[in-house]
Structures are given as structure tokens and as C-alpha cells.
């Protein structure tokens, strides 16, 4: 996104002046190299790990277009909370009014309009999402740059937004109505969150159309609209009549039990008198080895070794094969578990099968632990 920003800015600032282009590129190159040299002690190791990451080296499908549902959700997602290929926008409704006012202004804000149109095109084409994500998979995590642009547009348009003329009010009102009708006609954008956001925008527009209100109070109206939009998004996200996201939360006590609970307790007791122990199983917690200090067969990190993912793929391990950075055991295969030097196998009492060659050892309230009769030492497999 930075490269696109610089290119567009150079075009608008320098035009066809080749000399200024050369000076600008040279100055930018020197500054970039200087910055990279200053950050090399951190940048180079991270770059090395990133380029050798399993997700970066794993072939991924690249579609020419997103699914239809993606495009159907986009209009509503501009002003309401939501996630669609990590296209998280959910801007406050005054941003929509500012964008409409910007495009109403002829021969003004050309650079901002260009940035907005380029960003909109990038959101609609999967290639840009994949390119911005290191060519690993389609994902619009770069959307924070678009959010920064929209915030800047609101700041630039604020003086005009609080001093709207009649023609501008009519234009924004008609455009807001068309936007609302389009969203209501599309199933994927039709929801209570959008109705609340548009209602806040309509009330704000009516308030800004009143003439005998000073500029300070108009600014306060916009601020209140931003706060109400954020509050409405939060209510629809967490309330029981909305997505009920808050119901997924647990108490601090339950969180501590999940993190330091029975899995850790059961395996830690058995590992007290052992120099090395590795365990596998079903229904286990990811990255529990960070807490227990005991090696396991479950892993879920952003950056992982590509050779491990290739080994799992070659062995046709079906569990989470589509996520090369997420390992879930060894498909409960006795041979692979033995080759991984796993001497213990844990099964959740809520469900799970025990592979061949394991005998019962102990249990607690949530897990049953089995001993591997065919365990191999760590050095045997390396």
C-alpha cells in the first residue's frame, strides 16, 4: 500500500517533471535503505523466517473473483461491524457522509478520490488481497490502510460537513437513501446493524441542515454520531438479540481452569521424574507446551517450518492439512505417533478413540492418559 501511495502522490505532485521524479525516487531510496540498515538486526531474521514459512511456500488457490456473498456483503460492511475475508471496515456513518460529499465536489480532492477508487478496486479483486498477504492466501488484512484513508477524508471534509449547503444536503440525502435501498435489497447486507447506522446518519444529516446552530455544536453533533455508531455496532455485536458475541466469553476462573487445567495437571504429574516426554492425543489445547514445558504434537503458530508441513502432506495426514501452520497430532496413527517419540496419549472424556498399542495409565475429570507400548527414543527418529 505504501508503494501505491507513493506512486500516486508522485504523479499528482510531479506530473511529467522527470527531474523531480528522479530526485524524489533517489531521496526515497536513500531514506529506505537507511531505515532498513537501522532495523536490519530485527528485519533480516524476520524476513528469513517469513520467506521460509510453511504458508509462504505452500501452493494456494487464487481466484479471479471472490464468491458472490463477498460482494453482496461489501456495501453494508462499510458502516457496520463484520468480517469478510478480513475486510473489516465498520466505519462510523459520518465517514460515509464525508465520502459522498467528497465525490460531490467537482475538481477538488482529486488525489483523495483516486486513492479511494484504487482502494475500492483492490478490495474487489482477490489478487491484491493475496499479494498484500505475502502471496500466501486471499486476505484483506491491509484494510487498516483504507481505514486510515477514510479517517483522513473525514478530517478533510469536516469543515464542509458542518457547513453544508442545500444542494449538498439534498445530494447526500438522496445518495444515502439509494445506499440504504441497495443494502435492503441484498440479503447479505440486510440487517439491524445497517438500519441503525443509516438512521444515525439520517438524523445527523437533518441536524446539520438546521441553520441556526453554530459550528461548535455541529462538530459536537458529528462527534456524538460517531460515538452512537460505535455504540450501536457494539450492541448488535454483543447483545442477545444480535450476534450474542458476549455469550462466548467465560469468567476469569474458567479461563484459568482452561489454561492451567486438567490436561496440564495430568501430564505434568507423569513427567516429574522423566528427562524427556512427548505426548499426543485428541481434543488437546494448542501450544500448551509453552505452559507445561512438555513437548506435544499440537502446534498453532503464525510462522512454522515448511518441511514439517511437507512431511504431514506427504503422509496424507488429514487433520488440518489445509492449514500448514496448524498441527493436530498425527491422525491417531500408531506408527507416526511412535516415530514422533510420543510416549503418552491423552483422550478427552467427551470423545475420542485410542490407537493400537496403547495401555491405560491414569485419568482425571476430563482426560484419560494412555502409555505407548511401542515408544521410540527421541534420538532414534532424528
Predicted regions and their residues:
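Periplasmic/ER-lumenal interhelical loops and adjacent helix-loop junctions
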Residues: 24-28, 32-115, 119-140, 144, ...
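Membrane-interfacial segments
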Residues: 11-16, 50, 54, 161-166, ...
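Short, well-ordered loop/turn and helix-capping segments at boundaries between secondary-structure elements
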Residues: 6-13, 43, 130, 151-155, ...
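Soluble catalytic regions of membrane-associated enzymes that act on cell-envelope
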Residues: 221-382
Amino acid at each position: 500500500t505504501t508503494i501505491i501511495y507513493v506512486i500516486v502522490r508522485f504523479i499528482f505532485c510531479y506530473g511529467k517533471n522527470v527531474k523531480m521524479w528522479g530526485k524524489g525516487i533517489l531521496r526515497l531510496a536513500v531514506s529506505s535503505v537507511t531505515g532498513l540498515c537501522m532495523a536490519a538486526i530485527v528485519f533480516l531474521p524476520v524476513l528469513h523466517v517469513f520467506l521460509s514459512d510453511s504458508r509462504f511456500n505452500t501452493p494456494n488457490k487464487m481466484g479471479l473473483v471472490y464468491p458472490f456473498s463477498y460482494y453482496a456483503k461489501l456495501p453494508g460492511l462499510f458502516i457496520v461491524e463484520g468480517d469478510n475475508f478480513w475486510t473489516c471496515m465498520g466505519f462510523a456513518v459520518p465517514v460515509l457522509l464525508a465520502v459522498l460529499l467528497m465525490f460531490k465536489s467537482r475538481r477538488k480532492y482529486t488525489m483523495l478520490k483516486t486513492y479511494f477508487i484504487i482502494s475500492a478496486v483492490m478490495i474487489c479483486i482477490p489478487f491484491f488481497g493475496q499479494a498484500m498477504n505475502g502471496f500466501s492466501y486471499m486476505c484483506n488484512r491491509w484494510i487498516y490502510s483504507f481505514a486510515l484513508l477514510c479517517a483522513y477524508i473525514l478530517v478533510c471534509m469536516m469543515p464542509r460537513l458542518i457547513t453544508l449547503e442545500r444542494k449538498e444536503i439534498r445530494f447526500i440525502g438522496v445518495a444515502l437513501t439509494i445506499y440504504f435501498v441497495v443494502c435492503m435489497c441484498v440479503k447479505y447486507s440486510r440487517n439491524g446493524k445497517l438500519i441503525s447506522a443509516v438512521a444515525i446518519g439520517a438524523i445527523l444529516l437533518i441536524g446539520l441542515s438546521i441553520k441556526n446552530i453554530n459550528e461548535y455544536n455541529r462538530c459536537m453533533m458529528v462527534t456524538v454520531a460517531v460515538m452512537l455508531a460505535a455504540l450501536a455496532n457494539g450492541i448488535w455485536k454483543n447483545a442477545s438479540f444480535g450476534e450474542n458475541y458476549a455469550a462466548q466469553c467465560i469468567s476469569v476462573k474458567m479461563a484459568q481452569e482452561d489454561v492451567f487445567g486438567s490436561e496440564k495437571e495430568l501430564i505434568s504429574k507423569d513427567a516429574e521424574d522423566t528427562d524427556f516426554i512427548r505426548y499426543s492425543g485428541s481434543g488437546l489445547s494448542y501450544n500448551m507446551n509453552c505452559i507445561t514445558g512438555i513437548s506435544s504434537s499440537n502446534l498453532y503458530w503464525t510462522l512454522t517450518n515448511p518441511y514439517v508441513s511437507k512431511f504431514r502432506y506427504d503422509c496424507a495426514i488429514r487433520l488440518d492439512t489445509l492449514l500448514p501452520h496448524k498441527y493436530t497430532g498425527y491422525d491417531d496413527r500408531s506408527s507416526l505417533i511412535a516415530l514422533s517419540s510420543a510416549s503418552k496419549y491423552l483422550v478427552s472424556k467427551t470423545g475420542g478413540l485410542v490407537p493400537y498399542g496403547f495401555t491405560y495409565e491414569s485419568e482425571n475429570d476430563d482426560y484419560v492418559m494412555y502409555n505407548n507400548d511401542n515408544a521410540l527414543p527421541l534420538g532414534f527418529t532424528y
